[in-house]
Each structure stands twice: as C-alpha cells, then as structure tokens.
Amino acid sequence: MDFFTNPNVLFYITAYLVGGIPFGYILAKIFAGVDIKQSGSKSIGATNVLRVVKEKDPKLAKKLAIATVVFDALKGAVLVLIAKLLGFPPATWWLIGIMTVLGHCYSPFLKFEGGKGVATGMGVLLVLLPVETIIGIVTWLIVAKTTKISSLSSLSGLVALVVASFIVHPDMPYVHSHAPLLLLAFIIFYKHLPNIKRLLTGQEGKVAA
C-alpha cells in the first residue's frame, strides 16, 4: 500500500494538523484583539490567554481561557474517539494522541511553535485512561488552588497521572506497555523545561485568581 494512502498514516497527519490548530491564539486574536504570541510567555495555551487578555478585560480573559482549555482538550479526545469508533488498533489510538499533542506543541501554522500540550494531552488521556486522568485533574486542582502556579500544578497532575497508571493498570490495557504514556508525558515535560528552571530558582510567576 502506498505510504500516503495508508489510512494510519493519513490519520497521523490529520492528527498533527488538527493538533496544530492554535485555538488560544485564534480566540485571543478575534475576541480580544491581542497577539498572545507576542505577549506574556508567548505560549498559545490557556494560562497565557488568561494572563495577556486579563490586562484588557478580566472577565473576558477567564471566558477565553476556559474556552481554550475546552477546545484544546477536544482536539485530543475527539480524534482518539474517532479512531476507536473506526476500528483502528489500540497502538494507533496512542500514536494519534501523541501526534495531536506534538501538533499542539509544534504547530505547523505558527512556524512550529505552540503550547505546552497539557490540555490536549488531558483530552487524549481522558479517553484512553479516564481513571488516571481524573486523579491527575484532582491533583492539578489542589496544587493550583494552593500555589496558583500553573506550571507546577500541571506537572504535579501529570506526575500523579503517570504514577496512578502503574497502580491502576500495571499491565497497560491493549498495548501492554507504559511506553506510549511515558512518551506523551516526556513531550509535555520537555515543553515545560523553562518553567522547571524557573521553579527551581523560585522565579516562576503565579497566576492571579
């Protein structure tokens, strides 16, 4: 079968392109008239949308940040669900999820720059590992409420999710390996390296409520 007509390959390419849709950038540009790629952390995620738009309109900032989380999560969840419904094998579900997160982190529409992959990864994992993801979300909420540091809460939630996966599913369903999850987690951690450096030096900023 020709490489570019292989259904799996076409789905991977589609996942990367859909993952690359910068909803935070689009929403902030259309509804607030700001370019989040030129302000704040320059990330396209919800935290930067909140931080940048809040300077103009605090109420609008919260709405756009929530919308960004929802749309970014849906990118991951919907594509994996479609793959499951179409009967693709489980390994393909994971690869589609990983490609979607890569698209978000390295968007082809933004010169291969993008976000941190947290919300999109959450969408993917809600479909593939719902119990572990809920544990991660609860951890994220607790740390966010306590510290008000977005990166710390996101990374804490991710660590909790990964640890929980070894307890809830010692033998990962279908694929029998934690490698796909660890790869996805690595991508998100890698995108957070600047934040981790600031956390270690006490320079990471908080997000006001």
Swiss-Prot record:
Main location: membrane
GO molecular function (one): acyl-phosphate glycerol-3-phosphate acyltransferase activity
Membrane topology of this protein: Multi-pass membrane protein
Keyword flag Transport: no
Keywords: Cell inner membrane, Cell membrane, Lipid biosynthesis, Lipid metabolism, Membrane, Phospholipid biosynthesis, Phospholipid metabolism, Transferase, Transmembrane, Transmembrane helix
GO biological process per UniProt: phospholipid biosynthetic process
EC number: 2.3.1.275
UniProt key word Lipid biosynthesis: yes
Listed GO CC annotations: plasma membrane
Bilayer-spanning residue ranges: 8-28, 78-98, 124-144, 149-169, 170-190
Catalysed reaction, written as an equation: an acyl phosphate + sn-glycerol 3-phosphate = a 1-acyl-sn-glycero-3-phosphate + phosphate
InterPro entries: G3P_acylTferase_PlsY
Compartments, record wording: Cell inner membrane
Similarity comment text for this entry: Belongs to the PlsY family.
Stored NCBIfam families: glycerol-3-phosphate 1-O-acyltransferase PlsY (TIGR00023)
Cited function: Catalyzes the transfer of an acyl group from acyl-phosphate (acyl-PO(4)) to glycerol-3-phosphate (G3P) to form lysophosphatidic acid (LPA). This enzyme utilizes acyl-phosphate as fatty acyl donor, but not acyl-CoA or acyl-ACP.
Protein name: Glycerol-3-phosphate acyltransferase
Organism encoding this protein: Nitratiruptor sp. (strain SB155-2)
